[in-house]
Amino acid sequence: MCGFVGCFDLNSGSAPIAQGLREELRAQVLEMSKKIRHRGPDWSGVYTGENAILSHERLSIVDPLSGKQPLVSDDGKIILAANGEIYNHKTLRAQFDGKYQFKTGSDCEVIIPLYKKYRATGDFTAMIEELSGIFAFALYDSENDCYLIARDEIGVNPLYQGWEKAGR
């Protein structure tokens, strides 16, 4: 199983986060990520943006050569860190043929175009119901400055959420 760590809402409040604090938070996220490296010894990746940091420790099962995470959408605006197996990924991939330019063969990449499909309506329950499998993920939409954290309905893959003093 893979593992991931994220920090969102870095700019919560009226003032943007100071660069020094962003780097401090990035270091903390990387330190937390090191603690779960045993869950994904094949690849470590990190995304650092204006309002989010995502780190991923990958265990390569599907697409070991190009499925490095965090995954980034074809337009560069959506970032995804996921742990799971999407059993119906081939069916979902076919659904988005010609509508989304997949960058990898990763089964989890289908979460990105699925999110884009449901983003306008905000019906993310319907989005999750389209996914068959065991999964947990954190997705950051940099264009709309929002995030979605979800897991499968049974909760096979662990997913923990918390906040620090400033509410991030």
Stretches with model-predicted labels:
Residues M1-R168:
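N-terminus-centric sequence/structural signature that marks the extreme N-terminus
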